[in-house]
Amino acid sequence: MLFKALLFSLIVSPLVTAHGKVSVITGDAGGNTTALAIQGGIVPGPGKNSVTEVDTTVFRKTNILSDGLGRTTGQGANKVKMLAQAIALSGDTLPQVSDNGTISGVFHIVTTDGAGPVKAVLDPTGTGAFSQGTMLRTVTQVPGKHGNIAAPQQRSLHMRALVAMGIVKRAANVNEDFPVEFSVPAGTTCSGTINGINNVCLVKIANSNKAGPFGGVVAIQMASQVGSNNDTAVSTKCGRAFIA
């Protein structure tokens, strides 16, 4: 009976269970945002991986200097137009970064394979062309080794048996937040336009776990470019973004 139960678990359990995501990023000159495709409080912290991982971005390559915005299980391929969704969650003002300033925020480790260390690369065109981007210096790092972190002590007999048999990978729910911070080089300018918002850069933050990699993409602006006429002032009524 136990063997049959374990076989049933093999059928219904995902084989790759690992995730970490960018919950919020703030600029040193103000403003904040979430990563593209983040769904907010409707996604629980603890629980089954199939429920807790739906808005975690997975990238195709472990090399941080690779193009693309990644994808989530909840919404499929990430798109720049999802910035409207991020603004609806976080407010009208994107992270504003001063010259030689920083971005900081929260990296949420969902499961044990979604940990640090993480890296960040900035795309000044706001299109996801990260292969041509600029690496950011890490100021505050997310804990972990090769994208892994120690699992919680409490694990069910059911899960221990599945792990021992090699049926599922060793990725238990962690549900913990960790601070992260990156330095943006002096002289950085943003040329992207997303949903009518000008002067936008995209920043990819991700670990290098081969099961993923996992992380997220956030939009930022350089405060000196925005000035007194804030290009992030938009309306999100009816789920649409308009210039204010």
Regions found by a protein language model. Give the residues of each.
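Exoplasmic/lumenal beta-rich domain surfaces
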Residues: G128-S183
